[in-house]
Regions:
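N-terminal pre-domain/capping segments
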Residues: 1-78, 82-101, 263
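A general structural motif
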Residues: 12-14, 37-41, 69-73, 106-113, ...
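Acidic-and-aromatic substrate-binding clefts and catalytic sites of carbohydrate-active enzymes
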Residues: 20-30, 46-59, 83-90, 122-124, ...
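Histidine-acidic metal/acid-base catalytic patches
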Residues: 2-13, 30-32, 85, 166-176, ...
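Active-site acidic/histidine proton-transfer and metal-coordination neighborhood
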Residues: 6, 85-177
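Alpha-helix-loop-beta-strand connector modules within alpha/beta enzyme cores
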Residues: 61-81, 135-147, 227-233
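Charged helix-capping and loop-helix junction motifs
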Residues: 56-62, 91-100, 130-138, 189-197, ...
Length: 263
């Protein structure tokens, strides 16, 4: 039997509190059964695009039933093993086909958003955007829009490059933003500046600790000066905050930090 969270965090904050669907070392349904009674939202992780790694239609039906039973919502993290900026046409086709398939599969769950990675694989990563890469990203997103995807349903996550690199694409297709605080801090970005610039487009914040280059740790990995900066943003935010850690102990410690700093 897995340990339960000590109390409910539903409607506790100005934002919706979320956690990933792999907190416990088990499949989707056991995780959602354990987390659903305590949280506003669950981040359904679909990191891998292979059919065997995705939830089945039967699992989706059960996940839909659990959301109704425990009164929570889902957000979906789209696959990360596909590359919309690839120079290879085959890879860009796979990106479009995969996202359409996963979004169709999870449609019954009425996700609040779909979190999307737009990886930049140029090396070394500098401060100058590769315009050819930017153009390929734009083409891939346009193909999604042509297939019927609505721009506001996608939240582009901050990764290992400045979000400004894709800002023209965000504007052109009316995309939303997922601010991953851990990634911003690890990449030495100014979180307050980035938040102010993209606050109107930000629907999702990913929250996890960072220490010595390692991320997705519990929030107690941060010293108080970092926590003060993070929570000055969270206290003004009304979207979804997903504590993006992958173990019960890290989630429990993070929820304690959250509760202490939101007083």
């Amino acid at each position: 039997m897995y340990p339960q969270l000590p109390k409910s965090y539903k409607n506790a904050y100005p934002f919706r509190i979320s956690a990933p669907s792999f907190i416990y070392p088990d499949d989707y349904i056991p995780n959602v059964q354990m987390l659903g009674p305590y949280l506003d939202e669950i981040e359904l992780l679909c990191f891998e695009s292979h059919e065997s790694s995705l939830p089945s239609q039967e699992t989706i039906r059960e996940l839909e039933s659990l959301a109704k039973e425990f009164k929570f919502t889902y957000n979906v993290h789209l696959p990360t093993d596909i590359d919309p900026g690839s120079p290879e046409r085959k890879e860009k086709n796979r990106f479009v086909e995969t996202l359409l398939r996963v979004m169709d599969l999870t449609l019954p769950l009425a996700p609040t958003t779909h979190t999307l990675h737009l990886p930049c694989n140029q090396a070394p990563i500098g401060r100058i955007c590769d315009k050819a890469w930017q153009g390929r990203i734009s083409e891939s997103i346009r193909r999604l829009m042509d297939a019927g995807v609505k721009g506001p349903s996608l939240s582009v996550e901050t990764l290992n490059y400045p979000l400004e690199w894709v800002e023209p694409i965000l504007r052109e297709y009316d995309l939303r933003v997922c601010l991953d605080m851990g990634h911003l801090i690890a990449n030495h970005e100014k979180i307050e500046t980035t938040y102010h610039r993209f606050a109107g487009q930000t629907t999702m914040i990913h929250l996890h600790g960072v220490n010595n280059g390692k991320d997705h740790l519990a929030l107690d990995a941060f010293d108080q000066s970092w926590l003060d900066k993070i929570f000055s943003i969270l206290k003004r935010f009304t979207g979804t905050v997903s504590i993006e850690v992958f173990s019960y102990n890290h989630l429990l410690a993070s929820l304690a930090v959250l509760e202490k700093n939101m007083r």
